[in-house]
C-alpha cells in the first residue's frame, strides 16, 4: 500500500500531495516491508517523558484532564505563547504574517507529534519547520490549501518519508530512529483509508477486508469471518461481501477500505481525503460513520483498558466535513501550522486566514496565486 522509499532518496520523484499507493492494487497499511532506514538529519528538538498518562476510566470523564499524568510533557496545554519563530530560509515575515502559531489546549497527550520538521523534494520545500500534534482520543483534521504537504504528513507518520530536519513521534517514540523491526511493528498501530479505498481488484469484498488478518495474524478462518462480518456490518456492507471492487460504487469502495483499515484494531486511523469524489449527502453520511465508529472504539478502549485511546486524523479540503466531524483542527499553510486547537476555538478564531478558509469565502488573505 505504501509503495517504496524511493521518494525519500529521489526527492523530486515524489508528489507533494496524494496517496502513496504506487500501484493499482496497493497492499494494506501494514503489508509492506520496512524501507531502508535513514535517520533524520536533525536531532530531536526536545526530550519526551515516557510516563503513562491517565485513561478516561481513571479520571471519571471522557477526557484525561490536562496536567494530570506523568506524561504531562506530551499533553497539549498552552500556558503562554512561545516566542514567534523566525520565517524559513528564503521567506520573510510578510510571507508568514497570518501565522500566529497559536496552539489552543486539547488536554490530551499527542498520539503523533511533529517537531520542527523540514522536508523538501528537489527545490520544492514542502514542510518548513512544522510543529503539529494529533491529540490522543480525538478526531483531528489537517486542513489547508492544496499543495501544502498534508499527505506528506501522513507518509512521515508511518515512516515512508523521513524529515530532512526535525523529528516525528508516535506515542512518544521517534519514527526516524526506529530499527526496521520496530518500524514494522509500529505501522500496525495505523489503519489507513485512501481516497479510493485502495482495494485489490482481483479479490471480492470479503477477501479484501480479510487480507490483513490472514497476512498478519494466526487467527482461524472462523475468527477471521467473525471479525470481517462485524466490520462489514459497521460500514453497512454485509450484503455485498461477494461483490468485486468494480461492482462497487465510489462510496461503497471507501466504506470497504474503512472496514479493512479497522480489522487489526489500530490505535491511529488516517483518512486521506475520504470525501473526495462524494456528493454532499454521502460526504455527510461518511462523516457520521467516522464519528460513530470512533465512539464505538472509545467505548471498547474503556472496557479493555487499552494503553492508548483511538485517534483519528482526517485530511480534507471540505470545510463542512471539518465543521461536522472535527474535535481538533490543524490549519496548515506554507509548510507550517497557522493555528491549531479544538474545533470550537478554531471556528471562532479571529485570524483572517482561519476565518476565510473555514468559511469558504473568497475575500481574505488566500488568493488564487
Indicate where each model-derived feature is located.
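Conserved ABC ATPase "signature" region
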Residues: 173-174, 221-239, 291
